[in-house]
């Protein structure tokens, strides 16, 4: 384990404004990738990019407002859940799956860094940096805040960390048995003893069992669809939603629901939602599921599947079924989704636009507001509530 040294305390820290805690606290945090670009459908390294950053956003007000930005390594590669904020909004953990090769700035290579940011200091700052595995992407922390799991996309492993006093300590690494499994998203059930892990590369969802710092796998994996990716669990722990990204070839893609009340757990619904549904999120009350579809916005303009925008689709959750309620255009290369604590504001990351799309969600209707610029590509977004 390495604590953060001079890298964190020198020019790597960039603050927009001092972090003033809103009266009714409701923060979102975004992981912003500055080093990756998409030019006419080709993803590559940016030329002389500024540092990647984490933005801290006050969503207790409308429109939401960015109140601080801290330099920390991150990446768009992997599911848009590569950042986590503690329930008391005191610290953040963010992962980095890729970086520009220091000896060859024309190449992007796997990264393994995990950074911890203290939000209680003024200004907020990085206080620890530790390594996970190659392609460190998804970060999820147990409900009691004592155990963190990091999916290492480039090596097919899952890193296990203990969490105490805003510090991580490595306690193990689990080999998934397939270096091309591409583990993508992991989420704990409310009991803290069970978790789910999506495997984009071999089309599986694993059920994990947690006993202290020991993590084991159920021998029966779940099947949802082609390339299961982003994962979310509703507040009550009764349903999980999984985005099935498909092959990115223009075909319609899907979202599946997993019933968490039955033993064994099982997939109970799969519905077509759009093309490449990278982002998805349950509303705070669990009554709605928001899905962000890329819709070909990352492809070359010459592709027959190219669109100049993505789509945000909101579904009502009716038992174990989904019913479409509303749809609106969003920016290009859409990523993660977050709701405000009251469920009335929705934020969606758009990598190419370097901004968050902002919507009011009231009366079953989406009303777009002004985009919120975060300076570089918002690759992931999280709030403190589950």
Model-derived segments and their meaning:
Residues 21-386:
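Predominantly soluble domains enriched in secretory-pathway, periplasmic, or organellar proteins
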């Amino acid at each position: 384990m390495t604590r953060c040294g001079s890298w964190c305390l020198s020019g790597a820290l960039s603050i927009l404004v001092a972090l003033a805690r809103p009266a009714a606290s409701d923060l979102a945090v975004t992981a912003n990738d500055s080093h990756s670009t998409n030019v006419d459908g080709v993803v590559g390294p940016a030329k002389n990019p500024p540092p990647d950053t984490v933005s801290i956003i006050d969503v207790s007000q409308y429109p939401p407002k960015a109140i601080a930005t801290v330099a920390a390594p991150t990446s768009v590669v992997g599911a848009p859940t590569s950042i986590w904020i503690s329930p008391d909004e005191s610290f953040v953990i963010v992962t980095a799956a890729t970086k520009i090769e220091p000896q060859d700035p024309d190449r992007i290579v796997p990264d393994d860094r995990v950074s911890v940011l203290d939000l209680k200091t003024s200004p907020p700052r990085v206080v620890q940096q530790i390594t996970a595995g190659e392609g460190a992407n998804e970060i999820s922390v147990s409900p009691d805040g004592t155990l963190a799991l990091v999916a290492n996309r480039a090596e097919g492993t899952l890193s296990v960390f203990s969490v105490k006093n805003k510090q991580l300590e490595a306690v193990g690494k689990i080999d998934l048995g397939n270096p091309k499994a591409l583990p993508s998203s992991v989420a704990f059930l409310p009991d803290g003893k069970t978790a789910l892990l999506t495997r984009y590369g071999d089309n599986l969802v694993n059920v994990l069992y947690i006993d202290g710092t020991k993590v084991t796998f159920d021998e029966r994996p779940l099947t949802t669809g082609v390339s299961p990716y982003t994962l979310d669990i509703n507040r009550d722990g009764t349903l999980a939603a999984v985005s099935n990204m498909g092959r990115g070839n223009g075909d319609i893609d899907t979202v599946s629901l997993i019933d968490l009340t039955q033993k064994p757990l099982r997939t109970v619904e799969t519905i077509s939602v759009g093309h490449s549904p990278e982002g998805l999120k349950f509303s705070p009350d669990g009554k709605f599921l928001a899905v962000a579809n890329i819709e070909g916005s990352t492809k070359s303009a010459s592709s027959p599947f190219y669109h100049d925008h993505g789509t945000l689709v909101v579904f009502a959750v009716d038992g174990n079924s989904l019913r479409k309620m509303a749809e609106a255009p969003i920016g290009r290369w859409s990523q993660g989704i977050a709701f405000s604590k009251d469920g009335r504001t929705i934020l969606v990351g758009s990598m190419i636009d370097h901004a968050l799309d902002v919507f009011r969600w009231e009366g079953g209707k989406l009303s777009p507001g002004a985009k919120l610029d975060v300076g570089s590509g918002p690759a992931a977004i999280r709030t403190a509530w589950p």
